[in-house]
Amino acid sequence: SKFLIELFSSDAMKNDGAVLLFRTKSANFDNLKKLTPGDNIRVSVTVLPATFVKGPPEHKVRLQGANELLKLGYQISMNIDPIILTTDTVKTYKKIIDDIKTYFDYSSERFHRITIGMLRFGSKNLDNNIRKRHVDLYRHTKTSKMVKIPGDEKHRYDRELRVELYKSLVE
């Protein structure tokens, strides 16, 4: 990261409009804390409920780490992706949104954006990878309201369901 931050912090890169984006599910930001970020250096942190993520730290820990980076001058984005439909989806993801408000200074001018996305798979991924590596998720795709979108070749929740969920999350 040091090499990349130094490279992207150069005047030439800044003048060209180059942006360096680190995407992570980690809360270990020790290497970034030692460096001085330029205005074009962003860190994008994925925050998901522990129910669906095995391995990465709890989302509150990631939010706190991201907040520390924000205070050090990094631009921060949040990703809530993928949203997986369950009986408690709205409650679960509204809790994450509330935790962003609690553990992260989203009013900072260094806060870049929040992106939200639903679970989706390319047909090849579904058959070749997901079925073998994530049996429960594969079963979910077969028993939920996921459909293959013509022309897109991706399995997604149907549009009406996605729009309904997005609306309920922003209310």
Segment roles from a protein language model:
Residues S1-L7, G55-G65, K91-K101, D158-V170:
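Well-ordered, non-membrane alpha-helical segments in soluble/globular domains
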Residues D30, V53, I84-T86, R139:
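Generic, ordered loop/turn and secondary-structure boundary motif
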Residues F29-P37, T89-I97, D127-N129:
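Distinct, well-ordered alpha-helical segments
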Residues D98-E171:
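Auxiliary Fe-S-binding modules of radical SAM enzymes
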Residues S1-R62, Q75-N79, F111-G117:
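Core AdoMet radical
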Residues V61-N125:
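Conserved C-terminal portion of the radical SAM core fold
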Residues D39-S44, G65-I76, N129-S144:
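A glycine-rich, aromatic-flanked flexible loop/lid motif
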Residues S10-D16, G65-I76, Y106-R110, E160-E171:
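A structural motif corresponding to the C-terminal end of an alpha-helix
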